[in-house]
Design a protein with these regions (language model features):
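DNA-contacting interfaces and partner/effector-binding or oligomerization modules
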Residues: 6-17, 21, 30, 41, ...
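Short, surface-exposed, polar/charged, turn-prone segments marking secondary-structure boundaries
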Residues: 37, 46-48, 75-78, 86-88, ...
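Short N-terminal micro-motifs specific to bacterial/archaeal maturation
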Residues: 16-19, 56, 114, 130-133, ...
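A glycine-centered beta-loop-beta connector
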Residues: 32, 41-63, 146-149, 154-169
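The conserved cystathionine-beta-synthase
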Residues: 19-43, 69-72, 132-150, 157, ...
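Tandem CBS (Bateman) regulatory domains
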Residues: 1-15, 62-131, 143, 147, ...
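Residue-level detector of functional hotspots within protein domains
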Residues: 3-5, 33-35, 51, 106-109, ...
Length: 182
């Protein structure tokens, strides 16, 4: 297996979907849809959040959007539930939480209203240090970060500058190709 570097697989930041803090979730979805249409159906499922100066400040992922559209997720502590179950998320825990918190019972009209009202600044993810990876690192290191639970996608840097995004699916594709070549 030939070692690939992160910079060989990442999506350059200038080619990634960008939104601003003041945009609504509806705006995010529209921006993602426009990107998909302009790129022959190839879709990004998350967006980079940039400040007024155009510099990276965070990201909005599918999980961030789902949690914003269903506010009852804010009432539970997933880590606490998993730890209480000895590190496992069982069918019983999932069913119990689903019933106890009435997840996804709001009509789509309510979800539409939430999507229009929620701002990116309210739901965006501000990455921790463990979610950044340098361009010159190996794909294996990126895979290691993902397996240990890094919030997707990883943010790629060169020095102090954010230069790209590394999606889990793109890392998987590198490994898949290597396995097929065996």
């Amino acid at each position: 297996m030939e070692t690939k570097l992160v910079r060989e697989v990442m999506i350059p930041i200038e080619k990634y979907v960008k939104v601003k803090e003041e945009d609504s979730l509806y705006d995010v979805i529209q921006t993602l849809e426009s990107y998909k249409t302009a790129h022959n159906g190839r879709a990004h499922r998350d967006a980079v959040v940039v400040g007024e100066d155009g510099k990276f400040i965070g990201k909005v992922t599918m999980i961030d959007i789902f949690r914003a559209l269903e506010p009852n997720y804010n009432k539970i502590n997933v880590e606490e539930i998993v730890e209480g179950g000895k590190g496992e998320l069982t069918e019983e825990m999932i069913t119990s939480a689903y019933k106890d918190f009435d997840f996804w019972v709001a009509p789509s009209k309510t979800i539409c209203e939430r999507g229009m009202a929620k701002k990116v600044s309210e739901v965006m993810h501000i990455p921790s240090d463990g979610e950044y990876i340098m361009e010159e690192e190996s794909i294996e290191k990126a895979l290691h970060l993902y397996v240990l639970g890094a919030h997707q996608p990883l943010i790629v840097k060169k020095g102090d500058a954010v230069t790209g995004m590394l999606r889990f699916g793109d890392v998987f594709e590198v490994i898949r190709r290597d396995l097929i070549a065996c």
